[in-house]
């Protein structure tokens, strides 16, 4: 009885077999009559391996070099996939403009950086906030404080800091890494919080440097396996990346909170000097409950990112001048002709120094300090140039590849920006794209200009005779020269006295 019942349940009868066959035939005919959809046609990329795909074929450290090699094989669009993720690398300015600028509504989001964003807490900061209302609120605050008109009030601070840099280099030229770090950080601290400091060992400068090193390593896409497999964030606290994340969270919270609270206390005491934070807190005082946290994180983003890129760019410039004294001499001749040797450079001189501006552009092109910018993420499925780009694809602009897409790319040649057929101006890619364009662009450009122009005006930068200087750069999110030696000497006693005199006039 039981066996008979089992056979009746498990084995179809002849009529039921016929019904099933008819059903399958009907389905097959229906499928043949349906319009055929094309399979996903992803952009080209390295061969896909079982399970992991191609996503792990490039090390996060210095990935821009490998991306540029792959461009020669696969072209301007480079696609990786695996472990449930898709990554699209943009290797041309056209592709970047088409997607990040013209389709900014689709490509203005950020990927979820599980470690640095969620576990370390940096996801509250404007650079990593998802595209939406909260991000727009942060953006409005930053724009109001850093518009082209607003940053003019900080010209004096930036010029004072340039003079202070020169004075410190006169006293201790071999410590130029430390001096540039101090001055780049000091500009940001003074502008954002009204907090000038005296040494590079100051707790604000030193802590910002350590914190930005942590952020720089963690913000490179794929730096942690947890970024590719977010469920790993639930692993216990003793796992190494969890310990790193916990330390990073404490460092980031201190970075954004301590100077902010300093300004609040100074405002309560009536002793707060002018600053971005003071302005924003004063302007939004009637709505403080809603915006104080936003102001803290908006100004914290300025503090963390602003000094780092200025520091890196000036170090690249010093290296380039030590390697190319003939370019330095031509820039000095222009400064002597336009400004003379009776006064210190000013930001207002910028429009009258075309060759100096070309030197700055070439510095930015020769080694971009943000070689991969900061990754984006597609908000929906998209089609570009005949290729499918799935929703949630991480999109990386290969800035280093674009900067090197010109004749004699390894040569330092400012003249290329003064001739016909000049490369794309680095300012069009150095500060981001579309709706994610860095609001600190104008402040940053002014800082780089006045620091570089002051160094050209006052000093001769030459190689160290005991060391063969070879360009060598770090491989993190922000890339700058590894420690190197060079000689930084005043052009004359008169130039040295000019720097000392101007530094004595500073307002702090």
Swiss-Prot record:
<keyword id="KW-0325">Glycoprotein</keyword>
<dbReference type="GO" id="GO:0020037">
    <property type="term" value="F:heme binding"/>
</dbReference>
<dbReference type="GO" id="GO:0016020">
    <property type="term" value="C:membrane"/>
</dbReference>
<feature type="transmembrane region" description="Helical">
    <location>
        <begin position="14"/>
        <end position="34"/>
    </location>
</feature>
<feature type="binding site" description="axial binding residue">
    <location>
        <position position="438"/>
    </location>
    <ligand>
        <name>heme</name>
    </ligand>
</feature>
<protein>
    <recommendedName>
        <fullName>Cytochrome P450 monooxygenase 74</fullName>
        <ecNumber>1.-.-.-</ecNumber>
    </recommendedName>
</protein>
<keyword id="KW-0472">Membrane</keyword>
<dbReference type="GO" id="GO:0016705">
    <property type="term" value="F:oxidoreductase activity, acting on paired donors, with incorporation or reduction of molecular oxygen"/>
</dbReference>
<keyword id="KW-1133">Transmembrane helix</keyword>
<comment type="function">
    <text>Cytochrome P450 monooxygenase that is able to use 3,5-dimethoxy-trans-stilbene and 3,5,4'-trimethoxy-trans-stilbene as substrates for oxidation.</text>
</comment>
<comment type="similarity">
    <text>Belongs to the cytochrome P450 family.</text>
</comment>
<dbReference type="InterPro" id="IPR017972">
    <property type="entry name" value="Cyt_P450_CS"/>
</dbReference>
<dbReference type="InterPro" id="IPR002401">
    <property type="entry name" value="Cyt_P450_E_grp-I"/>
</dbReference>
<dbReference type="Pfam" id="PF00067">
    <property type="entry name" value="p450"/>
</dbReference>
<keyword id="KW-0503">Monooxygenase</keyword>
<dbReference type="InterPro" id="IPR001128">
    <property type="entry name" value="Cyt_P450"/>
</dbReference>
<dbReference type="InterPro" id="IPR036396">
    <property type="entry name" value="Cyt_P450_sf"/>
</dbReference>
<feature type="glycosylation site" description="N-linked (GlcNAc...) asparagine">
    <location>
        <position position="464"/>
    </location>
</feature>
<dbReference type="GO" id="GO:0004497">
    <property type="term" value="F:monooxygenase activity"/>
</dbReference>
<keyword id="KW-0479">Metal-binding</keyword>
<comment type="pathway">
    <text>Secondary metabolite biosynthesis.</text>
</comment>
<dbReference type="GO" id="GO:0005506">
    <property type="term" value="F:iron ion binding"/>
</dbReference>
<keyword id="KW-0560">Oxidoreductase</keyword>
<keyword id="KW-0812">Transmembrane</keyword>
<keyword id="KW-0349">Heme</keyword>
<dbReference type="InterPro" id="IPR050364">
    <property type="entry name" value="Cytochrome_P450_fung"/>
</dbReference>
<keyword id="KW-0408">Iron</keyword>
